A protein has these predicted regions:
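ABC transporter nucleotide-binding domain
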Residues: 101-181
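Helix N-cap at the start of a conserved alpha-helix in ABC-type nucleotide-binding domains
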Residues: 96-98
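Conserved catalytic motifs of ABC-family nucleotide-binding domains
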Residues: 81
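ABC nucleotide-binding domain signature
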Residues: 13-17, 135
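ABC-family P-loop ATPase nucleotide-binding domains
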Residues: 17-73
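ABC ATPase NBD Q-loop/coupling interface
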Residues: 1-8
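Catalytic Walker B motif of ABC-type/P-loop ATPase nucleotide-binding domains
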Residues: 85-89
């Protein structure tokens, strides 16, 4: 049965997209009620506790800044207590202090509950502090997948003028004139 047709499976998955969506004119309290009704494992005590971490204004969430909308998404999604958390550009739009705080909350959830977190990001430096395993996708194809330590120790970017020498495993190649990367 596809995930989309299985409510028991869907409620175990939390997803925060780069471009978060909220119902038109929905307030944080409206979304709080919605999440509480949809997710049977919604943790009301955690939701109240996270209000300290995410001091959000009142009013329509769509009027919040991108960073505030992202904070609202983390507040709601973490309170739903998913087993798997899928994050697309999770800290995009957040200031540096909030970036650290959000990732700290996610890592605490991993440590306390064993949550599996999948992160899609273009900012690899940001992931070094929170990931233990990485994969590189290019146009939907997995180019490389290994532990972060192995990735850092054995993968390099090489630029040469002229043709690339034979015998080197190449994950991705681009060419500009005689410059191969």
């Amino acid at each position: 049965q596809p995930v989309a047709d299985d409510p028991n499976l869907k409620e175990r998955i939390g997803y925060i997209s780069d471009d978060v969506f909220y119902f038109p004119a929905a307030t944080m309290e409206d979304m709080h009620r919605f999440y509480r009704d949809v997710y049977s494992r919604f943790d009301e005590a955690l939701y109240q506790k996270l209000k300290e971490a995410f001091p959000l204004p009142t009013g329509s969430i769509r009027r919040f800044s991108k960073g505030m909308q992202k904070q609202a998404a983390f507040h709601l999604t973490l309170s739903a207590r998913p087993d798997v958390l899928i994050l697309d550009e999770p800290v995009d739009g957040l200031d540096p202090v909030m970036r650290r705080q959000v990732m700290s909350l996610v890592l605490s959830d991993v440590a306390e509950r064993g949550t599996t977190v999948l992160i899609s990001s273009h900012n690899l430096r940001e992931l070094e502090d929170v990931c233990d395993h990485v994969g590189i996708l290019n146009h939907g194809k997995m180019l490389l997948e290994k532990s972060l330590a192995d990735m850092q120790g054995g993968t390099v970017k090489l630029q040469i003028v002229g043709d690339a020498p034979a015998g080197f495993p190449v994950l991705h190649e681009s060419r500009s004139g005689r410059l191969n990367t």
